[in-house]
Amino acid sequence: MKRSGGLFLTSLLLTVLACTLPTTAPIVAQAPSTLASALDPVAASAPPAPGNLAEPAADLAALYREVDPGVVAIWTFGSVDGAHETSVPLGQGTGFVIDTQGHIVTNQHVVADAEEIEVDFPSGMRAWAEVLGTDLDSDLAVLKVDVPADRLFPLPLGDSDQVQVGETVIAIGNPFGLSGTMTSGIVSAIGRTLDSERASPGGQPFSSGDILQTDAAINPGNSGGPLINLQGEVIGVNRAIRTESFTVSGDAANSGVGFAIPVNIVKRVVPSLIEEGHYDYPYLGVSSLSQSTLNLNTLERLKLPADTVGIYVTCVAAGGPADQAGLRGAGACENGDLLPGGDLIVAIDGHSLETFNDLISYLVSSTQVGQQIVITVLRQGEEVELTLSVGARP
């Protein structure tokens, strides 16, 4: 049967594993870690960053030895209708240690619907975990295990704002249950946008910005594992793959296009998940698209200048922050048709914006709920400044 391409979350359902691996004895996975002491750069017990070695192959071998102890395999269990056992395997993914207090970062979709969660460490140690908090928007979750601090190896967190296209990276995880697997590649692109795991009041999914794209092989089971630079720092959390390839059993297979949540989002979201169990995302209440994605015919129909970049507002949510501030949409809230009349957002607080990702990135990294911001829009050829109070995503 011919299958069309699509985007796949990379946790591994055990119905897939059952075709190739026994579910009675899960394969132990390696554990990465970082985010120590509420996101201090490196935990006290974190292994030192690998030195500069002469041979690239030796570099990667040393890097693996340093970071692998911080990567863990995550197994989820729950109830299934018709099952005789009280708890049956549901799925498997990857996570990494972020501090010596037992906090582990993974994807939200890895632990969704789990009633019990087992964490397997590279040393052979296993522990039950509890979920402290989840975030559907970023697809992040924080787990807590009761493990002695001297047996945890937190991974240092890097700075995803410094990531460059072409930079060499590695991914460590448990693809198809093969624990401790390392793959390497490069950062293929930065600033991608992915749909959130939840929908806005209008029915369209919220968006996650600043997503990293990599060609390092990411497959089912890699979800929640770290994307690591050559300095041994986590720069992203592996989340999804886009593929047109499938295994003989019908499962999505890697085709060189993987996506990772930037670590700077992790730094911002995870402390709130630990303390409060959730994170409130800044919210404007608009649907929009990058003007750069429109061709000349569309620009002329919408009466937009071809020499100005920005974010075209297609819809403004009634009663939302943008609506209260007087932002104008094109009235495409119901049918999604591209109509003229919407504002073109060109700046926030004096910072120029060119793409929809720029808008999402600025809101998440530079604003918080309740903050007053100034939005500059192009309206009928004139620049207009509007003051807006940032809301929280409903």
Question: What residue ranges belong to the model's regions?
Answer:
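Acidic, Ser/Thr/Gly/Pro-rich low-complexity segments that form flexible
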Residues: 315, 319, 327-330
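Bacterial N-terminal signal peptides that target proteins for export
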Residues: 1-9
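Serine-dependent protease modules
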Residues: 24-309, 356, 364, 370-371, ...
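Bacterial signal peptide processing site
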Residues: 20-22
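C-terminal motif of bacterial Sec signal peptides marking the signal peptidase cleavage site
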Residues: 16-18
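Conserved PDZ fold ligand-binding element
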Residues: 104-105, 324-357
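Surface-exposed loops/turns
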Residues: 318, 368-369
